Amino acid sequence: MTPANLLQLIILAAIWGASFLFMRIAVPALGPVWLIEWRVLLGALLLALAGRWFRHSLALRAHWRHYLVLGLFNSALPFVLFAWAAQTLTASLLSVVNATAPIWGAVIAWAWSREPLKGRVAAGLALGVAGVALLMGLDPAMLKPGSGWVLAGVLLAPCCYAIASHYAKSARNALLPYANAHGSMWAATLLLWPVLPFAGHAPLPETATPVLVWGAVLGLGLLCTGLAYLMYFRLVAALGAASALTVTFLIPVFGILWGHLFLGEAVGWQTLAGALVVLTGTALVTGFDPRTLWVRKAVSHG
């Protein structure tokens, strides 16, 4: 992994960490399905503008089935699951659940492509899980009464991400990362559209705070979806599915930070300790060597 790849990984984690904050703010007003419909629609519109600017084509007739698969597993299903759980669970806990995606990814990599699980990768995954446990302090108080089944259900969301990631990896030579991101957003928009009449929530109740809710919706759609997913598919193409999925090890760091700053969630010593362990696990899984930074500097100054 190059320093540029690592920087992209951290920026992407900060953006996606904010998505749980935005969902917690907006989902009480809009409901899970309505919120995610807005999210994928705004993301699709932003990517459409980018495609027009850079003159990228979707080749929709040739690849519409591919986009439907990505739209279902990388957007519609996991997004709705997280939004549904955001009605009950905290943003911090949701960001930790998201961190199980690399574990699912390693299992699926072995089952899908027989990609060997090397000792370094296994150690990194173990450290990542340990770091997540430290971040949350294994505090049962994080779970409200009756929320265990919600937690069990939302664990399916990172599994969907892992499936989509490996599917995208198998098709990356045929389509540009932009096409994957753009096509999947429009597919998710279409997949969720028939569900809206049965979703229950009105688009915006009168009791909601319009500025706060719509600000969260815009942040979720434009920043956490349109921009973030374009960055993510580029990382999949550059690093491979298993390494790109390790961005989710970093997301709890930012998810807890944003939760503390904007939702008043407490941050203890385990946050700092967990962050260190998580970053170490990420380095092991991705194979990043900090010494490459010094090598590049020496070359550039020579």
Could you describe each region identified by the protein language model?
Residues 36-38, 75, 79, 93-100, ...:
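Helix-helix packing/entry segments at the starts of transmembrane helices
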Residues 27-77, 102-105, 159-164, 181-202, ...:
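Transmembrane alpha-helices of multi-pass small-molecule transport proteins
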Residues 15, 19-20, 48-98, 134, ...:
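Specific transmembrane alpha-helical segments of multi-pass solute transporters/efflux pumps
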Residues 47, 105-107, 111, 125, ...:
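Transmembrane alpha-helical segments that form core, pore/gating elements
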Residues 26, 35, 39, 85, ...:
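Hydrophobic/aromatic residues within transmembrane alpha-helices
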Residues 46-58, 82, 101-126, 253-273:
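C-terminal transmembrane-helix exit sites in multi-pass transporters
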Residues 47, 68, 108, 117-139, ...:
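Hydrophobic transmembrane alpha-helices of multi-pass small-molecule transport proteins
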Residues 1-6, 29-33, 37, 59-65, ...:
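Juxtamembrane helix-entry segments on the extracytoplasmic side of multipass membrane proteins
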